[in-house]
Amino acid sequence: MSDQSEYKISKDDEHSIYASEINKEKLQNTASPDVDYGDTASLKIDPKVEKKLLLKMDLVISPIIGFLYLMAFLDRSNIGNAAVAGMTEALSLYGERLNVAVSIFYVLYILVETPSVVLVKRIKASRMLAFISFAWSMTVLFSGFMSSYGGLIATRLILGLLEGCLFPALNLYLTTHYTRKEQCQRLSYLFASAGLAGAFGGLFAYALEQVHAGNKEGWQWIYIVEGLVSFIGVPLCLFALPDKMENAWFLTREEREVAIIRRDINARYHGEQHFEWSEVRKAFKDPKVYVSATSQFCADMVLYGFSSFLPVIIKGLGFVGLQTNYMTIPVYIAGVISFLFVAWLSDRTQLRAVYLISASTVVAVGYIIMLASDSNAAKYTATYIIAIGCYIGPGLNLGWLNNNVAGHYKRATAIGIQQTLANSSGIVAGQIYRSKNAPKYILGNAFTLGCVIVGGLAYVVMFFSLRYVNKKRDERCARGEFDPSAIGDFADDFRYYL
């Protein structure tokens, strides 16, 4: 599907867009100054060298961004573990106070996503991520010293403000250094980190709950220790995460040359390197951004709700305490493995919609079982069915948007818009999955099932809309009709991923 998923180009454009040669002057102007590239008049990409380059990028970049997102996910979700470990009594979290504290995290979280992601390129990703990591680690650390409900609300707001800048920045970073056909697999590593946090976060918290030292209770040590561990991300970002692959410390001279050629090949995808408000406005006016945001909202509802009712169902099977945590592990692992495989397959086939629609169908079946059955065994089986598709939806849909928005600042804005609207589902989930509705959570599960159906329909709308545009562009190109004023993903030679 190469023609259907990349730019179609004219012969005159071949050198500037998809050439395998790059001139010496460009290399010397953009590459690391400590490398002498010699005669590079006819450089070509060696597949073996590119394979080594990608492997090295994966081995360095993926663990760093995976660690950041894993800790961020732990730090935002540890409120539930802390509440069980004694924070409820210590801070008087009675009535709906805990639900409010959970939901209020997303108020500033969703407000900062769009403006922060636009700033990534101007600030440099390594510096921005290091600052975010430092600030949120400090916030989590000092959460261990809270003494009132007001203090909890304040720390949740600050944490939301900081973590709202994180995920869009990580996602945009991946789109900067990986090609369109490589992105979903790498994005799956981020969601795998979230799954691992869900699988083992409870065990980690359980171990910390047993600590009673320094006049601190177990719930306080959860915050203190997790905050300290999060600090590891600061030096990793500052000293190990490259802003430009042509200057990456872990690449050889030959691999840096290939990195430069890859960047040149994808020049039109990355678009204008200087900030322009017109690119921001294009994102706000693009209908596909809002269709994507709608389906992302629906997919995120599954994620946020899933983590709420899973422990309750397992407790209903007769398991208690540490046993409950053990029983959640295989469910989360099933979700992680499923998404890693589907993301790899999606990049391999360069298809998106077919996997998203299939995942929605699977998740819907799981929720129907959850609502229709009174058997805890059947409900536990349903959690596996839901887990198989719950990461595919938000992960692959975000990757689909990444693929189909060209121009760095337009794409950055589109990511911010999508994530802002989608993460408002966190506020909703905190209100429809209430403890008084346990263990059936009929309201929450029924609402989420409705979201799954709406999200699936949004995927269908997106697929047929993009296929129609691709077909029309094929026809115009066949007639030799090109609109020279159309740029980015609106250009006649741009083909959307389907």
From Swiss-Prot:
Its main location: membrane. The chain crosses the membrane at residues 54-74, 100-120, 128-148, 150-170, 188-208, 221-241, 302-322, 326-346, 353-373, 381-401, 446-466. Keywords: Membrane, Transmembrane, Transmembrane helix, Transport. It is found in: Membrane. It is a multi-pass membrane protein. GO terms for molecular function: carboxylic acid transmembrane transporter activity; transmembrane transporter activity. One of its GO terms (biological process) is carboxylic acid transmembrane transport. Gene3D superfamilies: MFS general substrate transporter like domains. Belongs to the major facilitator superfamily. Allantoate permease family. This is Uncharacterized transporter C11D3.18C. It comes from the Eukaryota. GO terms for cellular component: endoplasmic reticulum; membrane; plasma membrane. InterPro entries: MFS (IPR011701), MFS_dom (IPR020846), MFS_trans_sf (IPR036259).
